[in-house]
């Protein structure tokens, strides 16, 4: 018991895997700029925003950029056209840990690793230890050693409309939308060496870690939408008359 309390001799040390996996402070920032304006017949709004954040676990990152433009203009007193244009760039960077969710695997490692098990062979940080759960050894939790799993999403959306107001209570409006989404996954789980220390020979015996893989997925989905609408509203003395006629169509490609 005294040796465990001292924690200095090999085989009698304990290891805090929470401190190895989690960070106390992580940076986050958000930048936003917008402009509004116009004239007697035209109005516009433009906004650009960017968000960046590191995770509580090392080498995990997230960033997103958004763009939004709204504009409408009166061609005549009765005829109006307008558009809403938006775009998004979103990326997550993960470490190539076992399983589909790197965050979950990083947290799970704190419970899987034994506190009396060193992450490094002979406590030498040059050699990753051959532990009972090699894929969950935090000593390998970096993009340079374990690999990476990155997800990138790019999206653009355009909504355009034209509206005409007749003098007798009828309004005609046509709307067209186009959406394009591209999703890309790029993952590479590296093969790296793990070591067992031979105390008698003072050597480190290496063996490759198992379960390595490489995957890339690229998917684009364009979608289209159209709407034609007639609205009629009229008040005759104490009577209100209204009617709506519409037509919609949409399609998308996989």
Where are these regions (language model features)?
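Surface-exposed loop/interface segments of Gram-negative outer-membrane beta-barrel transport/assembly proteins
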Residues: 1-14, 25, 55-62, 66, ...
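Periplasmic plug
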Residues: 45-47, 82
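Outer-membrane beta-barrel initiation region
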Residues: 21-26, 35-39
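Short coil-to-beta-strand
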Residues: 40-44, 200-201
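Outer-membrane beta-barrel strand-turn architecture
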Residues: 38-41, 73-77, 164-170, 234-237
